Amino acid sequence: MKRNLKIAGVLALISVICALAIAGMNMVTSGIIKANTEKTELKTCQAIFSSYDKDKSEEMTSSNEAITKKVLAKDSNGNELGYLYTVTGKNAYGAITIMVAVKDDKVLQVEFLENGQSFASTVTSHVQNSYPSSPDDSVHVGAYKKEEASNIGSLSSSEIDGIDTACGATYGAKLVKELVNIALQDAKGGK
């Protein structure tokens, strides 16, 4: 009996030490991760709208919980450039966070901020071939780089509905389409 209690005590001590180590590491890295995320978002905003001014732009609220951030993008003179949506969704294959630029009820550009899908490279290729996307490889997070610049113009709601999601990662492609539609519908005022 004493032996079992001793083993249980040692295991409890090990688990407490591990928990403290994990919590400490989280405290050290959480600020760095947040700063890197903000830097990536700013870089993406500036890639979409080259004259984007973070200080003049207005962060807005949205009732849709998939929209994690909504910004009315403005230039340094306060002129409106369009809306920037950070939209997040998840399915059985992982999470996707994209930034969607909308102006005049059309999608101007779609960029990945996070692509955690199990077939991430296929989803990335599909998005780059189906939606307006940046030719700048550095905007895309992760190891998946665009092979050729997309010349797709802005897309209306009906054009987005017509995008074929059958690819090597159909569930990821459907999730991206759903997220783009969420942003577009919010920009249209839920119409």
For the regions a protein language model found, what residue spans apply to each?
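Flexible, solvent-exposed loop/hinge segments and secondary-structure transition points
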Residues: 2-191
